[in-house]
Curated annotation (Swiss-Prot):
GO terms for molecular function: RNA binding. GO terms for biological process: symbiont-mediated suppression of host innate immune response. Acts as a suppressor of RNA-mediated gene silencing, also known as post-transcriptional gene silencing (PTGS), a mechanism of plant viral defense that limits the accumulation of viral RNAs. Binds to short interfering RNAs (siRNAs) with high affinity. Acts as a molecular caliper to specifically select siRNAs based on the length of the duplex region of the RNA. It comes from Tomato bushy stunt virus (strain Cherry). GO terms for cellular component: virion component. This is RNA silencing suppressor p19.
Length: 172
């Protein structure tokens, strides 16, 4: 059964901490099934005292069309093969097809949201701009997943601007 949720605010639902999901349905924009960790696996990787911490095994994403929201949790281990797999979790065609099931004569709001390692990005627009919204969403997803937060954090915490560390190693 598809995870379609009724609600007034797609962004609020896209930022929810625990996602459960089922296998894909015919109206879903997603091509991959939900890969949410089991409860035991979730507890192994999370500190229960810090409810704002993301599970390090993957990321959350959602597509919302009006009041209907489709959510997915996808596993991502930051390898090239994993990146290629999750970038194909939806396409412009699959989003257009799913969205067309909810379009009437009026324009509806469409929202894409992704959350990875504490960073959330939400892109929204009207149904008439869905193609542009898809392009912005895939670009945002690709940039967010290709960031190396550990490397950036280590340079910032040492007070070194990016690239300084490389120069010091070469001059030794």
């Amino acid at each position: 059964m598809e995870r379609a949720i009724q609600g007034n605010d797609a962004r609020e639902q896209a930022n929810s901490e625990r996602w459960d999901g089922g296998s894909g349905g015919t109206t879903s924009p997603f091509k991959l099934p939900d890969e949410s960790p089991s409860w035991t696996e979730w507890r192994l990787h999370n500190d229960e005292t810090n409810s704002n911490q993301d599970n390090p095994l993957g990321f959350k994403e959602s597509w919302g069309f009006g009041k209907v929201v489709f959510k997915r949790y996808l596993r991502y281990d930051r390898t090239e093969a994993s990146l290629h797999r999750v970038l194909g979790s939806w396409t412009g065609d699959s989003v257009n097809y799913a969205a067309s099931r909810f379009f009437g004569f009026d324009q509806i709001g469409c929202t894409y949201s992704i959350r990875f390692r504490g960073v959330s990005i939400t892109v929204s627009g009207g149904s008439r701009t869905l193609q542009h919204l898809c392009e912005m969403a895939i670009r945002s997803k690709q940039e967010l997943l290709q960031l190396a937060p550990i490397e950036v954090e280590s340079n910032v915490s040492r007070g070194c601007p990016e690239g300084t560390e490389t120069f010091e190693k070469e001059s030794e």
